[in-house]
A protein has these predicted regions:
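C-terminal edge-of-domain segments
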Residues: 12, 107-108, 112-160
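Short beta-strand segments in beta-sandwich/barrel cores
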Residues: 19, 65-67, 92, 134-137
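An N-terminal domain-cap segment
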Residues: 1-60, 77
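Conserved hydrophobic/aromatic beta-strand scaffold that supports enzyme active sites
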Residues: 20, 31-35, 87-89, 127-129, ...
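Short, structured beta-strand-loop surface elements
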Residues: 52-112, 125
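Surface loops and adjacent helix of pleckstrin homology
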Residues: 50, 70, 140-142
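Short glycine-enriched loop/turn motifs at secondary-structure junctions
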Residues: 39-42, 86, 121
Length: 160
């Protein structure tokens, strides 16, 4: 991956607060959208999900999910297949309110998504942490890079 592609990937993951989520239960796939906050070292991604949402019920049965981000499309982009995009696969787990890291995770999530503060007062929402295991980064049409936790960790350092 060249430095420009590393910059694109870092930006997608650090600033992207809206991601597609793919879940599956009983051989029934489901894709939806969720708000997401990247941890500073990109080792995990925080989701604050309602138990009323179908995707939450799916991931409670099968914690293997995929999250995907894309650079924004727009009128100045003649071909959306040229947009940078990333898809990460891994596992998600709930963060108990009495867990040692809950307060830190909540603070980070609200720093990235301050409008979500009122949702933390609702009883049907729970904080989850997604840990990526594998992924694919496509910086543009016809170019693809397989990525893993070590690649994400390398991105969390200072830009080169």
């Amino acid at each position: 991956m060249n430095p420009e592609e590393q910059r694109q990937l870092r930006e997608l993951l650090r600033t992207g607060r809206w991601a597609a989520i793919a879940t599956a239960r009983d051989n029934e796939p489901l894709a939806s959208w969720v708000a997401v906050a990247a941890e500073d070292d990109l080792s995990g991604f925080l989701l604050h999900l309602s138990h009323l949402a179908l995707h939450t019920r799916y991931l409670e049965v099968n914690p293997r999910i995929s999250l995907s981000w894309s650079a924004p499309d727009g009128p100045d982009q003649p071909d959306p297949q040229q947009l940078a995009r990333v898809s990460l696969q891994g596992r998600v787990s709930a963060i108990s309110r009495d867990a040692a890291g809950y307060a830190v995770a909540r603070t980070l999530y609200l720093h990235r998504l301050p409008q979500a503060a009122q949702q933390f007062e609702l009883g049907d929402f729970e904080l989850y942490r997604f840990v990526p295991e594998t992924g694919r980064f496509v910086p543009g049409f016809g170019r693809v890079h397989r990525i893993g936790p070590d690649d994400l960790g390398a991105l969390s350092g200072p830009e080169k």
